[in-house]
Amino acid sequence: MALMEAWYPASRAESWDRVGLIAGDPSAHVTSILLAVDPVSAVVDEAIDEEAGLVITHHPLYLRGTSFLPTSDPKGASITRLIKNDIALFNAHTNADISADGVGDALAQLVGITSSSPLVPTGIDQAGRPIGHGRIGSITPTRLGDFLDLVAERLPAGPHGIFGSGDPGTIIERVAVSGGAGDSFLEAARESGADVFLTADLRHHPASEHLEGGAPALICGSHYATEWPWLPILERKLVQAASTANVEVRVKVSTIITEPWTSHRPTLGGRK
């Protein structure tokens, strides 16, 4: 827990967020850690099968709190099963979004952005690195259509896929990214001078109004897919820290795709 707090301090989380140890003994010794985006029942199954002592997720189990934990409720059942199997649950959410080596950096690195900086700066960390929401930087100049293909190849597989806007032949160089819901950063992406903004969960009206105003072009992936790239980075950090401390810990990224959608079909109807 001390490592997670050092890398992704809870004080950086948004006021509405819930981050930290959700269940478990903070002093317990663990030898196996499972990493996932969402604390859903399938991830709990995997944690039990893997005999994990700790599950670290990006999203909290109870963002808005609860007064009851019956096993008749899916979340109540999950937390009960975790406790019965002596598995702790921890999460880092918006504090991981803005921190160095967090969700923003992971997505930027995945799509080849170099020398990125926060799209919406919030401060400087203890190491003197700028932190904040999203990232912006440069890639080798390329056609928008080719960049769309690259994003599709590198994001984790899932039924959602990606959506793109703009002329695919346009040459782009400045790229802004924000993992997860990106509606609130559309204006920041425009003001940054980005040629394209990669994010997720864009709603119809904000996206349409943004595009009416011109650049940047938009690429919309799924919430899960744009936040998942952080997990391999966290895996490496935990493994390296364990090696430095001469401690044996097995760390694994969950194999469960926690997209809510399981299938996709292009719509083909319309007026003739």
Q: What label would you give each PLM region?
A:
Residues M1-K272:
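Hydrophobic structural segments
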